[in-house]
Amino acid sequence: MSQQQEQSPSLDDCLKLLKGERDEQRLAGLLLLTKFCRGDDHASIRRAYDAVGSQFLDRLLRTGMRKGPNGGSDNDNRDAYLQLSVTVLATLCRVPEIASSKEMVSKIPVVLEVMSKESVSPVLEECYEFLYLTSSTNEDGVTTLFESDGIRILASPISTFTDGSHLMELSMKLVQLMLSKVSLGIITDACLVEMSTIVAAIIRQFAMLHNALKFDALHLLSAIFSSDYSGPLKEELGRKTNNHWPDYLLIGVVAILQNRVAPAEKLHSLVLAETAISIMGERWLINPVKLPNMQEQVPPDRCLLLVLESSRVEVAVLLNDIAYLKYEASKNTSSTMESILSKRRHLGIAFSLVEKIIRLISTIGEEEGSLVDDNTFVKVINGLNETIAVVLEYLQDAKDHGQKKGDDLLASVRVVGSYLAETPMACKEKVRELLAYMLSVEGEDEPSSPFSSVCFLMPLLCQITMDFEGCKSLVSSGGHRAIVQCLVKLVGQNALTDSSGGIFLACDTVLNLLIKREELQLSMDASLYIDLLKALTYWADIFLLAYNSLGNKLCS
């Protein structure tokens, strides 16, 4: 109570000055306001704003910018006027009702202009504070911020800010606000280069910080890269690797995955890892980090092992959750369906990383002097074997429940096919047990008989049909019919793909079967092979390439 009594005269004096007729009185009142008004004293700030009025604040700001009638005549006081005006604006906007007012939103373009011309930290910080307070309380403020070249102005100084500074934090919050209101596609169409500069700066924060702002950066980056409109941004980042963003991203991902954090945070990090690989290639996982002033180097294989282990865990958890929701939870409720769709999206990230690691191991396994030693190689193979075993169990569960259609099932077949293409003998008994089922799996949008699942398994099928036992296993399951039907779709008049690689694999697989047809006692379905001959003829006419050996075998 005594403190309030001491402050009352100061507030009264301030209000009298703010209501004064002369500018000198009002200036003195504003100075007094910045001295004693606390940010949480909304009542006093509200009274001060009502006393001074928006018109005088506009005039003071424009004078500080040399835009008023006497703006250029008093250069000595210009900086002081500018500093005072933005400080007062930021102070007033601590009251949400003032910050969200049309008067304050209308000042956003002017404050952005100040930012584009000023490099003095105190002025900049007050400007950023004002922008955040106005934009976070009024959606029109966010729109005005973007339409007034906000992204370009934010991008200009962001790489010069100190790691973890208040300016950097406010910059990230402003970007997040704009993304919540404006589509990333619209933003990148308008200022792609500037947005890539901002993202690179945020990636550095994700790597270098060890506080809550690190996770803010993680969430913001994950949201950006998860957007359907992130393609152009990824391409632009691929053209500007000289600012070390791939190394910073690797450091941040490793820091999250190797520490005890919530599963959701690890999933966000996997999103970033998948993004980095899609831009830089699979070798990003094992590339040595080359950063100036790095005290502790990251071992070349650490990121690879952490990403694989985290992906393996995610696959196991997500498949278990999806199976529960599909087969045991309450059916056909909106919340159940939304949860399944969300988990499918997350599963797609984990599966994508597993496939990329498979490609990486396949490539480096044939190289000499690789950064991956034998011990790491064995760990990766063991991790992949465990992952594929879990996926096969999920497919077995789906088979037992009579489920053949679903994007999660098709994605499971794809990752199994990717691995078995490199190691056809892995999980041999389980694969042959499930082969017929996997060939029957369809995606949600496939209109008729299975196609994609057969294509995903074709590299495996081509390899196992090179020996009699593999052919026997395939024929006994009826898989040879699925292969022929797939080949018809690949080369027919309404071909579903233009991939010559898939066509040749399918042709070789059919040839392997036909060569051994007498031993297999393979019964010929005339109508099926007639359709294939017609399709091959059409394909040969189009590409001037007759696959004669296959045609001869069919007709012999």
Residue locations for each model-derived region?
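Elongated alpha-helical scaffolds that mediate protein-protein interactions in large eukaryotic proteins
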Residues: M1-S156, T160-V199, F206-H219, S226-D247, ...
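Well-ordered alpha-helical segments within folded domains of soluble proteins
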Residues: S85-T87, C127-E129, L347-V354, S412, ...
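Blade-edge beta-strand/turn elements of extracellular beta-propeller
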Residues: A201, G252-V253
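Leucine-rich repeat domain C-terminal region
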Residues: G252, R260-H268, L272-A276
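Alpha-helical repeat/alpha-solenoid scaffolds of the HEAT/ARM/MIF4G superfamily
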Residues: I279-H401
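Eukaryotic acidic, serine/threonine-rich low-complexity intrinsically disordered regions
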Residues: L410-V413, T423
